[in-house]
Design a protein with these regions (language model features):
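Surface-exposed loop and adjacent secondary-structure segments within mature catalytic domains
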Residues: 6-9, 73-78
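Juxtamembrane membrane-water interface segments that cap and precede transmembrane helices
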Residues: 76-88, 222, 309-310
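Surface-exposed, interaction-prone regions used to assemble/regulate multi-protein complexes
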Residues: 259-260
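Long, amphipathic alpha-helical stalk/connector segments used for oligomerization, subunit docking
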Residues: 185-187, 191
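Flexible, glycine/threonine-enriched loop-and-boundary segments that flank and lead into catalytic domains
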Residues: 217-226
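Hydrophobic cores of alpha-helical transmembrane segments in multi-pass integral membrane proteins
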Residues: 1, 12-33, 45-70, 87-113, ...
Length: 322
């Protein structure tokens, strides 16, 4: 029993429960903001607010359905319209749940750990407004070479390319905040987590716009390259910045000077970094191999490789993933 929608598979009763939970979350967050004792709202909270509002909008619109039983419903949309709304949701669920929320963490916890303010507050504000203005309209690049109108695909590609600028602006802002603390990379594994997270964020937000270009997408679409791209963001960026932030937060919550063992954090860092790099690299190589084999043709126009041959070629990379 699923809705058949990627990232939104849950049926309508659970969708309603998610809505209730999200409203409660929003009340707690915005209620806390309303009770603040200072007039200024730090930019990290702007990212959290955008994440909460946008996810609510995406969830409600994409989950609109006609129930036919307690465990089954059908989307209110059909055809290419349904596909476009689904990938407007899917793209922005990643963009706001796995990007905006964790940018808020980055803008708070990196300055806390290095003991200095964010490099450029003005740049962080520009980053925020540019990101939320552009990101919403790039979802059509998930549907290149489909029944979606070509102008919609091209417009989504254009917005995707524009996204490179604010994304890298935020990444550079985070890296420059660490400037002057590079000597601590040798002794502070928490800062290492944050540096690696920013590196993956920069890499992923370069790769995303590049893959939205139609000629590149013709090779990458439906392959493991796309999976590798998503995981470079989910494991490399989201995972690393979350771990680093937790290591900053936990001692403060429990009123301790620091974490129990810096050596264990250091071990955690190297295991996580090496594991993520191997995992993602195997997907990239596997995906490019798939794309090249699927596109290869003989002089008479027939396919050079069967689909089964392309699957067999990816076995070594799948073993690396395991």
């Amino acid at each position: 029993y699923t809705s058949t929608k990627e990232y939104a598979e849950l049926e309508w009763p659970i969708d309603l429960l998610i809505t209730v939970v999200w409203v409660a979350y929003a009340v707690v967050f915005f209620g806390t903001i309303a009770k603040r004792t200072t007039s200024h709202i730090y930019v990290a909270n702007w990212f959290f607010a955008a994440f909460i509002i946008t996810i609510a909008l995406l969830h409600i619109i994409n989950s609109m359905a006609v129930p036919v039983s307690l465990f089954k419903s059908y989307s209110m949309y059909s055809g290419a319209t349904d596909a476009m709304i689904q990938w407007w949701y899917g793209h922005n669920a990643v963009g706001f749940f796995l990007t905006a929320a964790f940018l808020g963490m980055m803008y708070y916890f990196i300055p806390v750990q290095v003991g200095r303010p964010v490099y450029s507050y003005r740049l962080s504000v520009v980053h925020f407004w540019a990101l939320i203005s552009v990101y919403m309209w790039a979802g059509g690049h998930h549907l290149h070479y489909t029944a979606l109108p070509d102008w919609t695909q091209s417009l989504a590609m254009a917005f995707s390319l524009v996204l490179f600028a604010p994304s890298w602006g935020g990444m550079i802002n985070g890296v420059m905040t660490l400037s002057g603390s590079w000597d601590r990379l040798r002794t502070d594994p928490i800062i290492r987590f944050m540096v690696v997270a920013l590196s993956f964020y920069g890499m992923s937000t370069f790769e995303g716009p590049m893959m939205s270009i139609k000629t590149v997408n013709a090779l990458s679409h439906y392959t493991d390259w796309t999976v590798g791209h998503v995981h470079s963001g989910a494991l490399g960026w989201v995972g690393m910045i979350t771990i680093g932030s937790m290591y900053v937060l936990i001692p403060r919550v429990f009123e301790r000077e620091r974490m129990y063992s810096i050596s264990l954090i250091n071990l955690h860092f190297w295991l996580a970094t090496i594991g993520v790099v191997i995992y993602i690299a195997s997907l990239w190589i596997s995906g490019i191999t798939q794309g090249l084999m699927w596109r290869a043709v003989n002089v008479d126009g027939t396919l050079t490789y069967t689909f089964v041959e392309s699957v067999k070629a990816t076995y070594p990379f799948y073993m690396i993933r395991v």
